[in-house]
């Protein structure tokens, strides 16, 4: 993976390498991803600051559902519901949707300024070795980047181990992990086992 990254860098591509296993202490994978984007700023420091400014609202996207779903604590969900009316929920949804669009727009602008017309390539390594909750959250976070032009994610994983993480995270051996993971991977390539 590192050789591929160096090859692309020599060809003029901006790349970022993320060893997810080393970073699974973080509570929010998006922070790790954007930290790597920040290291590529070059002449786009101003554009990067706009991305960060748009970030806080977009990070809240789905936070209430995440808390109640993944902690299993209905009381937390009820706490949110007691303090919101239906109109406030709709307004909040619209604000979050707008913030996510703004985040994507600022990220697109950053790529245009910094990447010379070429894609920004993220190499994600060791995701299959992470805690199941972090691995799934990482995938769920990067999906928000998929509709931004000129971003490519190359994810190096042992798919069998990642599938086990998905099963462990959702607490079900019956989940169709191939179907779930297909949402995140457009092209798959299996490396042959080396003959020693």
Question: Where are these predicted regions, by residue range?
Answer:
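The catalytic "switch" region of P-loop NTPases
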Residues: 1-7, 104, 109-120, 131-196
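P-loop NTPase nucleotide-binding core
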Residues: 3-111
